[in-house]
């Protein structure tokens, strides 16, 4: 009853806001409450040395499903604190409004139009008729995949840590991996201790890929089962699957070739182990943030390729961050049509709508400018004159909600860490959503007037 009353108050507070502002405020609210919960004395481990700023940074990173931290989870929070961490990651991955939506659906109450719009905005879901089924699909997919992942991981962690810690670790990692959060409850070395373990690496990689594909893809795939007459997969689904496979192949091969003889990363491993680590790192770099190599030992060109992968991110409508692979694909198709002098952006016997192209350009420009501004600010405020490639790595890791670091996060001061927090928050809700929520621009009559065409020379 208390939780239901709390949800009712949230609904009342957010009912008059636009979808963009509701997304903005819902994440801000969860971050505030989460930081206060993690600050409570009874959730602290006996070895904890964290301040409120550390709890706030951790909460922002968890709700924004990033993975950066100033204090390790294992040495900072006891079992109760780690359960709160899992809840924050889960809410961050799915969104507070989605949780509110499922409570209303389960209670057989009608979800308001603004609530539907907010959930659609959160997951870039354009259809309205099957929104209820879509929300059910989100939760079913999430808990089913996380459950299977935790079950498989338990075969390794229960013998390693015993029943209590083994089960907790399995569930924690499954939730973190599916939500592309990159957090673990081992310590500060991520998965380096399990670098060549095929079970752990492949299960976590599978969870990351599943979450990164986006719920629209899984909803589309799920509708193929249980029907006598199969309908064709949506073009979006086919595109995401194709692009994901291509990026994973490119990243794996490039890491394998560049780092093959590097003893600081994979040089001392066997050929199958090199392939496993290269594949896992490529999967993780897209938006998850689990580390199985020391990035300070990687070659600069490898880090640059990782930066590009983080910039592109995963698919829209899921737990992944970054620019989004479909956005980049639209830009490539448009560039091709311009080079060939074609009147429309065509691909696979389909025409991309001009509005989609315009939105893709807007997202790309805003994302790029946010990255550059964050890089400049982080370079100004970072202490110790770190390498430029590490600053780029840290900046895009935060903005794309990946969560990897070349050991730079623990060395940053509070001003620089505040910039990292802001980048994580912007990256999670989306730069475009942030601008819309802040500006809430309403066009006036002047914007409907068609003026003389401006003749501007470009290129």
List where the protein language model places each region:
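Membrane-proximal intracellular helices of multi-pass ion channels
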Residues: 1-459
């Amino acid at each position: 009853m208390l939780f239901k009353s709390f949800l009712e108050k949230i609904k009342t507070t957010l009912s008059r806001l636009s979808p963009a502002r509701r997304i903005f405020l819902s994440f801000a609210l969860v971050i505030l409450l989460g930081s206060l919960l993690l600050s409570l004395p009874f959730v602290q481990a006996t070895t904890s040395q964290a301040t409120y700023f550390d709890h706030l940074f951790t909460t922002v990173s968890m709700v924004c499903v990033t993975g950066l931290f100033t204090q390790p989870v294992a040495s900072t929070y006891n079992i109760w604190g780690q359960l709160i961490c899992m809840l924050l990651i889960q809410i961050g991955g799915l969104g507070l409004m989605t949780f509110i939506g499922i409570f209303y659906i389960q209670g057989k109450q009608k979800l308001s139009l603004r609530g539907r719009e907010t959930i659609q905005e959160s997951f870039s879901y354009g259809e309205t008729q099957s929104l209820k089924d879509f929300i059910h699909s989100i939760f079913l997919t999430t808990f089913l995949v996380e459950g299977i992942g935790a079950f498989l991981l338990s075969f390794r962690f229960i013998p390693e840590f015993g029943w209590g810690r083994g089960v907790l670790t399995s569930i924690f990692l499954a939730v973190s991996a599916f939500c592309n959060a990159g957090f673990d409850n081992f310590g500060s070395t991520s998965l380096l201790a399990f670098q060549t373990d095929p079970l752990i690496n492949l299960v976590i990689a599978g969870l990351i890929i599943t979450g990164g594909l986006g719920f629209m893809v899984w909803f589309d795939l799920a509708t193929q089962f249980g029907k006598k007459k199969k309908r064709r997969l949506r073009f979006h689904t086919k595109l995401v699957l194709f692009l994901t496979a291509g990026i994973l192949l490119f990243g794996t091969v490039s890491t394998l070739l560049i780092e093959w003889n590097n003893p600081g990363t994979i040089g001392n491993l066997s050929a199958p182990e090199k392939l496993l680590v290269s594949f896992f790192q490529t999967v993780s770099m897209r938006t998850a943030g689990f580390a199985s190599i020391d990035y300070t030992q990687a070659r600069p060109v490898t880090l640059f390729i990782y930066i590009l992968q983080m910039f592109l991110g995963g698919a829209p409508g899921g737990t992944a961050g970054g620019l989004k692979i479909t956005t980049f694909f639209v830009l490539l198709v448009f560039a091709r049509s311009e080079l060939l002098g074609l009147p429309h952006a065509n691909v696979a016997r389909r025409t991309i709508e001009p509005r989609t192209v315009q939105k893709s350009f807007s997202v790309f420009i805003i994302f790029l400018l946010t990255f550059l501004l964050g890089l400049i600010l982080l370079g100004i405020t970072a202490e110790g004159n770190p390498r430029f490639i590490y600053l780029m790595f840290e900046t895009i890791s935060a903005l794309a909600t990946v969560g990897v670091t070349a050991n730079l996060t623990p060395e940053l001061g509070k001003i620089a860490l505040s910039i990292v927090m802001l980048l994580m928050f912007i990256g999670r809700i989306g730069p475009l959503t942030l601008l819309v929520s802040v500006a809430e621009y309403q066009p006036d009559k002047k914007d409907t007037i068609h003026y003389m065409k401006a003749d501007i020379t470009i290129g």
